[in-house]
A protein has these predicted regions:
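Juxtamembrane/disordered regions of integral membrane proteins
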Residues: 1-148
């Protein structure tokens, strides 16, 4: 039962992480968020939350949960290692996709070639994925691993 609750908590933590980041960026008027009104930012939060929840569910079932239990079995019940695993697993889909797109463009000699802005955007997406992975790992750790 705790594992099922942990999967639910990890899945729900990702949309909350996105809402926290987008809300903070809107409050601080950073970049695109500073130029848009709150209704559009709210729609963006809903869209990204709807997309990220199934991805978080799949990653928790396929990799995050088993990895957390393996770490706990090896005696690593502290939050730090579980957080690092969440950060890595959260960033992995973005790194793989961006690496595929940039690599394919380079191999096919597509014009225009990826510039520094493309790489910066890829790093931003990977950072958002890592942030969401940290929240999911924390939620799973609190519900399932802590206090074992």
């Amino acid at each position: 039962m705790r594992i099922a609750l942990g999967v639910i908590a990890a899945t729900c933590a990702t949309p909350l992480a996105i809402a926290a980041v987008f809300g903070a960026l809107y409050s601080l008027q950073v970049g695109w968020f500073g130029e848009q009104g709150w209704p559009l930012v709210k729609e963006s939060i809903a869209l990204y939350a709807a997309f990220s929840a199934p991805v978080a569910f799949f990653l928790t079932i396929a990799a995050g949960g088993p990895l957390s239990h393996r770490l706990a079995h090896l005696g690593h019940t502290g939050f730090r290692r579980h957080a690092m695993a969440g950060i890595i697993l959260g960033a992995t889909p973005f790194i793989l996709f961006d690496g595929y797109v940039i690599g394919t463009n380079l191999l096919l000699d597509v014009r225009p070639a990826p510039d520094i802005n493309t790489v910066k955007m890829a790093l931003r997406w990977a950072a958002l994925g890592a942030w969401c992975g940290l929240w999911s790992a924390g939620a799973y750790w609190v519900v399932v691993i802590r206090g074992r």
